[in-house]
A protein has these predicted regions:
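AMP-binding/adenylate-forming catalytic domain of the ANL superfamily
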Residues: 214-235, 256-262
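Glycine-centered tight turns that cap/initiate beta-strands
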Residues: 18, 40, 74, 170-173, ...
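Short Gly/Pro-enriched turn/cap motifs at secondary-structure boundaries
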Residues: 66-71, 119-123
Length: 262
């Protein structure tokens, strides 16, 4: 929502409101200053889920813009590897969380005992989110584990690619999913919704991505949609996009002969 507001043409009345703080999940760091300068609003982010609570928050003093912040009082969080061993600072892993109060989290999934045991194993709730904890203790979201992309030996965050695409002035929304590569692993497929009246070409998007993303993370495929499939609470239904995959209407960077600069 923040990137949509920032892309709107300036309005002399845009600061005539009583809002001072706004919750802005998944907002890139540069937009924090844009929101403050244009609208006089301080943005706050964090991490929570239906099963848990607000475990991380940038309301913790000193948290950098674009991060998920630090651990809120009454909770604990860490980053672990596939063996549930704590990952070194700066290396990605799964976010696991727990609470000091036994009733601050849900007690499990109704009539799904196996799923409950899997999620709450080793006395930590396993979130399914891939994050990094930096040297200062701040948490940074990387991707959903199930949405991570592996291309030619490189790990790619769909979240990072989506943030760059969404920053394009002609893009209203974007979602990125992996599709099978001919030589194994994945290729990057981007679904893009343009702003009303805008008609960016796939080449325009490539040129915009090149100085902002590692070359291996730049989408090979681009598909323009009128809208993204969403759940009732507004989350992108990526499984539907993965099922759709590459279609006849999908632009292919390699077939188009677009050469990336390195």
């Amino acid at each position: 929502m923040v990137h949509v507001l920032v892309k709107r043409d300036p309005d002399p009345d845009e600061r005539r409101h009583s809002v001072r703080i706004a919750l802005a999940p998944a907002t890139p760091a540069p937009l924090y200053e844009d929101a403050r300068a244009r609208f006089g609003i301080e943005l706050v982010d964090g991490w929570g889920s239906t099963e848990t609570n607000v475990v991380l928050s940038t309301a913790v003093h000193g948290a950098p813009a674009g991060s998920k912040g630090g651990i809120t009082p009454g909770f604990d969080a860490r980053v672990v590897d596939e063996h549930d061993e704590e990952a070194p600072r700066g290396l990605p892993g799964e976010l696991v969380v727990r609470s000091d109060d036994p009733y601050a989290f849900s007690l499990g999934y109704n009539r799904l005992p196996e799923k409950t045991v899997e999620a709450w194993r080793n006395l930590w709730f396993h979130t399914g989110d891939r994050v990094v904890r930096d040297a200062d203790g701040w948490f940074w979201f990387v991707d959903r584990l199930k949405d991570s992309i592996r291309r030619r030996g490189e790990n790619i965050s769909s979240y990072e690619v989506e943030a760059v695409l969404a920053a394009h002035p002609d893009v209203a929304a974007a979602a990125v999913v992996p599709v099978p590569a001919e030589e194994g692993e994945d290729e990057v497929l981007a679904f893009v919704v343009t702003r009303a009246g805008a008609e960016p070409s796939p080449e325009d998007l490539m040129a915009f991505c090149e100085p902002r993303l590692a070359y291996f993370a730049i989408p090979r495929y681009v598909e323009f949609l009128s809208e993204l499939p969403l759940t009732p609470n507004g989350k992108v239904e990526k499984y539907r996009l993965r099922e759709r995959g590459v279609a006849a209407s999908t632009w292919d960077r390699e077939q188009a002969g677009y050469a990336l600069r390195r």
